[in-house]
């Protein structure tokens, strides 16, 4: 396992760059998700192996999701006592997914992911009134916990340790569940999504710690950046609400879809464009 001595293997300038990348990622992630699109490439550009980059990314991502969660709890938007079942099911789901992915070939599922992310973006794009205000709740208790916590948590855990960028749009899935099934407005749904994001991030981090791949010192520097960026983004979630969150989710979904499509079919796309 890497020690805090790894801090001295990275130049102060590079650490500063990673800190600000993490701050920007935390800001974006707290509003619409997708921060890993910035942090994973930055960590790999800094010279980390893919395994170390994914593990360290999970550490720093915990800073952002925990920061946002703390802010929303203090503002009394989220009540931990009301979310105990959702937290438990998310943790169980994320750990189950992370364990299962070690024994299952996920190639077919990866082909479906861009379509899922595109559908999320289109759904928010074509439903301008979605999450504008609270609506009647459709699902309660254990059924909701199984869907929002168990299923999305499993999805997040299944793809998270394997690919780094995944589960792509997990935060958007959480938010969508709170909007469509709980009837929350989009700001309130995003706040609750951060709580479940934090839960699945912690579950994923525990597995990476057991694997001994986390670069702790660099990860903690980025964690501080994530914490600060997420705090700023969380304030905007409550002050701007649906008017900010909806277009951000659409943009992040579009960028993430393009990234997923390129990862899966990059050579074919370049050949079709006559660039290869």
Where would I find each of the regions flagged by the language model?
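Transmembrane helix exit motif
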Residues: 2, 66-77, 114-138, 255-272
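Selected transmembrane alpha-helices and immediately adjacent juxtamembrane segments
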Residues: 2-49, 134-190, 275-276
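Structural signature of hydrophobic alpha-helical transmembrane segments
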Residues: 14, 48-63, 109-117, 154-157, ...
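Membrane-interface alpha-helices at helix entry/exit sites of multi-pass transporters
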Residues: 48-57, 80-85, 183-194
